[in-house]
Amino acid sequence: MKKIILFMSILAVANINAKSRSEMIREDLSKLGISQEIIVKTIELDKEIPNVVSEPDRGKIENMALEIEKVLKRNEKNFVLSENLINIYNAIGKNDTEKLNNLKRYEKYNPHEVSKLFFSNMYYSNKGDMESFDKNYEKLKEKYPDYLITRIAVTYVIGRDAIWNVMKNDEKTALATLNSIMKMCDDKIKTEESRISDEQAWAYKLTMGWFAISFYLNENRTQDAIDFYYENFEGKNKPSEEILYYNRYQNWYIKSELAKANKNDFYNNKKVFEKNLNKIKML
């Protein structure tokens, strides 16, 4: 099974209106008695975490880890930073002992079981501890079978290659499944119960969309890939600037892959070429 690094939102909200990641962090850490100074710094650091995997400068990532470690020492209840450190340690290859210490703090102070099960699952997957992974995974499916976060977990366990195989044999059914998950990502009640912020909901939506887009690109169906992206992530479905900033590297990667395919297939057809660039907002 492929190792998975996922950056998940882990914080609760009390009403049916979704909140931003920063609002969720402020609310949950305040309940733990963490100072406003530390909360503000946590929000600042957290905004850069989704882009760690795409950051080419290892020194920059290591400096970020040092800064997070310094803030975390001021209050170990800050489970947001414990989660962030695990993600950074995965990216730079820190040893398992340091990851486990942060996981223990994360599980101790994060009050939301659904997010703990999901994130711990990703930790065990990356570590290769499949016994612990299977235990958590079955518990997640049993206790939260209809939750968005469970649907996402199941999709990741299935994996890209298996999804591609289904699309080759029954594209309509595979797309219906991916579209149903993406629709849940737009449903504020569904994201609320899974403790997912607005920014992270769109990140998961992008990930589900990438399964289909990458399949189309692999099959040399560039126009289908571009149209799928436009219909789901641009136009009326384009999110706020705050959400785009949080997901800027993931979104830019997908756009870049589409732009390259568009150039290869349609550069000599200027009308189609430019129309497609406009669809993915690369003009």
Model-assigned labels for residue ranges:
Residues 18-83, 91:
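N-terminal leader/linker segments that initiate helical-solenoid repeat arrays
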Residues 65-114, 118:
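Post-signal peptide N-terminal segment of secreted/secretory-pathway proteins
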Residues 60-71, 96-108, 130-144, 169-192, ...:
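Alpha-helical repeat scaffolds
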